[in-house]
Amino acid sequence: MKRKFKRAILYARQHRANQEVNESLHRLVDFLSTQDIEIFQDSDTAASFELKAPVLPREKMGAKHDLIIVVGGDGSLLSASRMAIKVNAPVIGINRGRLGFLTDILPQDIESHLGPVLNGQYNEEERFLLHTKIYDKENSYFEGDALNDVVLGRGSETHLIEFDVYINQQLVSHYRSDGMILSTPTGSTAYALSAGGPIMHPQLNAIVLVPMFSHSLSSRPLVIDGEAEIELYISKSNETDLRISCDGHESRVVKPGQKVAVKKNGNRLRLLHPLDYHYYDTLRSKLGWESKHQG
């Protein structure tokens, strides 16, 4: 059995401030109050929800054996992940979203599933993030991290954009398309999947590049080594600014002639699951795959 947690930090995004999330947060506070654990909340959570728990500044998180409990959907966990990797604190999710690939625990199972986790009965896996940078010869303009994907999009353009893709300083191809999705295995069941990308097991050390509506019949998703360094050279022929987004949260302008570098972040997200969690069960359930049990 692993070490018990000493502190629980509750996290919910402001725009998810609805009755369902509020109910689960208060249910968590009531349950955690019966456990031998200190209860805190993140400052963003405190701004939108009235919980009987003190705010723990982010710079003080991770100082003890902390667990970050996210209430919301996968988007909420994506947001919390960028905070969690900076303090090396593990994360577990209560699903109040739609699909819930990352948020395992159902609201009605909070007590039965979270109790054993608090006492050290859980599975832990590491998920890597992508780090991206927008730059040119003179300056660096933006840096961000993504657990799911980094997306180059056409912004306000209504026609195809042009860019070159280099991997480890070697030219791969010139693209004319709506953009490019660069996804981790974690993100392979998100935006990349809807664009025709493959599903990758989350423990694979790989990155997938998925062109979006490419003007070429031979353009296909490309799975590469997770240690590779990727560069997108934005063609000067583009008539307007493009955009780069990280997990759909952070979005920045990319100008013609600039470059976008993408590589693995040195930190890992520590994602926890109840002991009865199985990845392929999640795929089958969330994607509606059929199952046939032999009698």
From Swiss-Prot:
It is an enzyme of class 2 (transferase). Gene3D superfamilies: Probable inorganic polyphosphate/atp-NAD kinase, domain 1 (3.40.50.10330), Probable inorganic polyphosphate/atp-NAD kinase, domain 2 (2.60.200.30). Its main location: cytoplasm. The active site is at D74. GO terms for molecular function: ATP binding; metal ion binding; NAD binding; NAD+ kinase activity. It is found in: Cytoplasm. Its EC number is 2.7.1.23. One of its GO terms (cellular component) is cytoplasm. Keywords: ATP-binding, Cytoplasm, Kinase, NAD, NADP, Nucleotide-binding, Transferase. Pfam families: NAD_kinase, NAD_kinase_C. NAD(+) binds at D74, G75, N148, D149, H159, R176, D178, T189, A190, Y191, A192, L193, S194. It catalyses: NAD(+) + ATP = ADP + NADP(+) + H(+). Its cofactor is a divalent metal cation. The keyword Iron-sulfur does not apply. Involved in the regulation of the intracellular balance of NAD and NADP, and is a key enzyme in the biosynthesis of NADP. Catalyzes specifically the phosphorylation on 2'-hydroxyl of the adenosine moiety of NAD to yield NADP. Belongs to the NAD kinase family. This is NAD kinase. It comes from Legionella pneumophila (strain Lens).
